[in-house]
Amino acid sequence: MMKISFIIATLNSGGAERALVTLANALCKEHEVSIIKFHAGESFYKLENEVKVTSLEQFRFDTLYHKIASRFKKFFALRKALKESKSDVFISFLDTTNIACIAAKIGLKTPLIISEHSNEAYLKPKIWRFLRRVSYPFCDALSVLGSSDKVYYERFVKRVKLLLNPCHFSDEISFDSSFEKENLVLFIGRLDHNKNPVMFLKAIAHLDKNLQENYKFVIAGDGQLRQELEYKVKSLGIKVDFLGRVENVKALYEKAKVLCLCSFVEGLPTVLIESLYFEVCRISSSYYNGAKDLIKDNHDGLLVGCDDEIALAKKLELVLNDENFRKELVNNAKQRCKDFEISHIKEEWLKLIAEVKNA
């Protein structure tokens, strides 16, 4: 039995958080698993009782002085937590947390695996890109989600492993499950610029009026653009239901016929994986830089240009008007399910942990 500590900023409703919780829940059956997080608050996703969660001490950030002082305090609190955990391996998630862990681990012998969950281009501030470039060579291993990211990081990181996110539904849904589908089209994700939900709304406005009337269009997620998007729905004269953050997305997948992803940049979008298990047809933007890792266009899903609402509307009309074609796409997509099974991904992680421990 090993002691494994995960480190992450929060356990909110993001895809990286979902992946961490799924992996922690799988590993805790055979190992002692803990999660160290920077911020207070409960996990959005259900954790097994065996997983121990601790939050670093919280500090003030209300003035410039406190912002600066608190960052130093947070760093030393992280280092203390790492030392006291007496872990066999550390696994950190997301870029800024990775950088902090590399610095906080200096002098400690415990190996550190860092995990990237966005495309390398997503980190925009130059200072953070610089810190990533100079710090990442000091990790013991780096896991990435896309083939293009693996090529990029191998230029300066000694051990880079392509590890897909596990789908927590893989233990719940059998391969031959069938679902009672409704005329439902989904958008699931944060309501921010990168997820580009306005593209979804504009595409709906371009659909044939009969399709607009006969289908229900739903956005599950919340974020800074919600009010702006609600105004946009009114100005376009369309009907869209805003559900906010949804804990039980399974119920939506079971009913939905189509899922749309409109992002500019992604790592390995959770929604494109989860939808495989529920016979939901996937239409995705050709986001930078890994859409083709998950979708073979016109075979197991459909790809459209980034921010091209006209193309999205045409692809939507294609599958909404041709149920046989939609079913062909989802049946082909189901062949990918085995790639994301929890048991398979867990074993891949254990192999990587063994590598860094024995290095």
From Swiss-Prot:
Impact after mutating T270A: 5-fold decrease in the turnover rate
Catalysed reactions listed for this entry: N-acetyl-alpha-D-galactosaminyl-(1->4)-N-acetyl-alpha-D-galactosaminyl-(1->3)-N,N'-diacetyl-alpha-D-bacillosaminyl-tri-trans,heptacis-undecaprenyl diphosphate + 3 UDP-N-acetyl-alpha-D-galactosamine = [alpha-D-GalNAc-(1->4)]4-alpha-D-GalNAc-(1->3)-alpha-D-diNAcBac-tri-trans,hepta-cis-undecaprenyl diphosphate + 3 UDP + 3 H(+)
Location(s), subcellular: Cell inner membrane
Chain positions recorded as substrate binding sites: E17, R71, F72, K73, K74, R190
Keyword Transport: no
Positions bound to UDP-N-acetyl-alpha-D-galactosamine: Y45, H117, R190, K195, V246, E266, G267, L268, P269, T270, V271, L272, I273, E274
InterPro entries referenced in this protein's UniProt entry, alphabetically: Glyco_trans_1, Glyco_trans_4-like_N
Listed GO CC annotations: plasma membrane
Effect of E274A: Abolishes catalytic activity
Main location: membrane
Membrane topology: Peripheral membrane protein
Pathway: Protein modification; protein glycosylation
Record-listed E.C. numbers: 2.4.1.292
Record-level GO BP terms: protein N-linked glycosylation via asparagine
Catalytic class of the enzyme: transferase
Domain of life of the native organism: Bacteria
Key word Cell membrane present: yes
Keyword annotations: Cell inner membrane, Cell membrane, Glycosyltransferase, Membrane, Transferase
UniProt GO MF annotations: hexosyltransferase activity
Result after altering K67A: 3-fold decrease in the turnover rate. Markedly accumulates the penta-LLO intermediate (Und-PP-BacGalNAc4). 1000-fold decrease in the turnover rate
Effect on the protein upon substituting E266A: Abolishes catalytic activity
Task performed by this protein: Processive glycosyltransferase that is part of the biosynthetic pathway of the lipid-linked oligosaccharide (LLO) that serves as the glycan donor in bacterial protein N-glycosylation. Catalyzes the transfer of exactly three alpha-(1->4)-N-acetylgalactosamine (GalNAc) units to the growing LLO precursor, GalNAc-alpha-(1->4)-GalNAc-alpha-(1->3)-diNAcBac-PP-undecaprenyl. Cannot accept UDP-GlcNAc as substrate.
Family from the record: Belongs to the glycosyltransferase group 1 family.
Note: N-linked protein glycosylation in C.jejuni consists in the transfer of a heptasaccharide (GalNAc-alpha1,4-GalNAc-alpha1,4-(Glcbeta1,3)-GalNAc-alpha1,4-GalNAc-alpha1,4-GalNAc-alpha1,3-bacillosamine) from a membrane-anchored undecaprenylpyrophosphate (Und-PP)-linked donor to the Asn side chain of proteins at the Asn-X-Ser/Thr motif.
Domain-level remarks: Contains an amphipathic helix (''ruler helix'') that has a dual role of facilitating membrane attachment and glycan counting. The ruler helix contains three positively charged side chains (Lys-67, Arg-71 and Lys-74) that can bind the pyrophosphate group of the LLO substrate and thus limit the addition of GalNAc units to three.
Protein name: GalNAc-alpha-(1->4)-GalNAc-alpha-(1->3)-diNAcBac-PP-undecaprenol alpha-1,4-N-acetyl-D-galactosaminyltransferase
Organism field: Campylobacter jejuni subsp. jejuni serotype O:2 (strain ATCC 700819 / NCTC 11168)
Organism ancestry: Bacteria, Pseudomonadati, Campylobacterota, Epsilonproteobacteria, Campylobacterales
Gene name as annotated: pglH
